Structure formats: structure tokens, C-alpha cells
């Protein structure tokens, strides 16, 4: 069995299919792991989501910020922007089933036999594996409740939860977890999340900011961390135990697939419109 990890697809379904054909992906024997953001911006979010649902246990994804945004749009909590490119999926007859499927997906996944953790944006350096498991599980539990829209999705949009506080309770605790696992790029030197800078490290002009993965972290030493979200990195992090897989396909660059067992990356350039 092969484990394939794919970067932010964001509706780039044709490129995904090209990649899977290159490696002869077979769901009866292989697994496809996605770092989140299955939807938004790209041309075919609906086909992407339906494909992942069809794979059953052969597909493993985590939630990204755009996947959570889709829940908010479906719940009429936010107004869609043209750049979201989600009209087709929101008007699809199986949108409720798609949302229910997304609600069952976690914010982090583990592959213990390979000492591997996958999340959309990364892992806060302050967290141990036990804390990561606990905090992600709290969000997953909230998403599965009948009142998830009012209790979580409607209140998750906030930059106030920028600092990890183990004594926080309720929505503030959940907000930090969502912010950290789906939105994080840079941290201030005191550990606070920054929500503004998206540049690669070599272009960041604020001396108070460092990429989250440059902080000392117990998980950075013990595990391979697989993440997406930060397209400007283009996969370049200078550490073999960090797998940054968002390579900007929806922005005209390429989609990246990582074969775990071979430690090999395969790419597919963004296809030109016919």
C-alpha cells in the first residue's frame, strides 16, 4: 500500500486526476491524504468533493480554512465572494450530504507507524502531541453537534484568539485551535499568531515575525509534519521532516503529491483553459 499526500487542491480537479494517473493510484490498495482546502477558487470544487466522498476509507483529509468557509456559506452565515467560486457546489443537490461529510473530518490526522502528523496550516510550537490531540478533538466534537452553526461556525471568525492560553474555555479555546491549525503562517516572537503576512520568509520585513516551523518544538523533533495553506513557500522549507505541499495550483502554479514510502514529490502544472 502507498500513502499519497496532496497539497491544497482548491477545486483543481483535473490536475488532481492527472497526478493520480501518474502514480497509478488505486483506492483498493492505496490511500490519498489531503492537507485540506479541497474547495474554493479553482474551477471544480464540486467534482473534487464528490471524488473524495466516493473514495470512502481510502481518502483521508483534514479541514482547511476554505472548507470551514464553505460551511459558513451553506449556513447563510457569510456572503460568498466571486473569488470563492463556490456557486456550483452551494447549489448542488447533494450539498447537505457534502457538508455533513466535511463535518466528520478532523483538523489533524496521524500516521503513528511513520511518526507523521498532518494538519492544514501546521502545529503551534507550544503544543505537545497530547495537547494537539485534545484541542483538535474539541473542535471535531463541536462540529458534530446539531447546533454547530450557531455554537461554532458563526463565532469562529475572530483574530482575538491569537495566543495559546491553556486556561481558556468555550469558544475562545476553539477559536485558537481553528486559527492555529487552519490559518497559521507566522508567529510573533512571544508566540502570538500573526494573521496578515503571507510572504515567504525571505520577503518578510517584520523582524518580530518568524515562521511557525522555525520555533523550537517537541513535535518538530519527533515527527514529520505535513501541511499546506502557505502557497508562497512553494514547498521550500529546508527541512526533510517538514512537508509543505501547497504549491499554488489555483494561482497558476502546480499541484504537488508526495509519495510517503518513496519520499518522492510528483507535480502537475496548472492546466490551461481549453
Swiss-Prot record:
Gene3D superfamilies (alphabetical): 3.60.21.10
Annotated GO MF terms: bis(5'-nucleosyl)-tetraphosphatase (symmetrical) activity; phosphatase activity
A GO CC annotation given for this chain: cytoplasm
Any Pfam family: Metallophos
Protein family (similarity comment): Belongs to the Ap4A hydrolase family.
Its job: Hydrolyzes diadenosine 5',5'''-P1,P4-tetraphosphate to yield ADP.
UniProt-recorded name of the protein: Bis(5'-nucleosyl)-tetraphosphatase, symmetrical
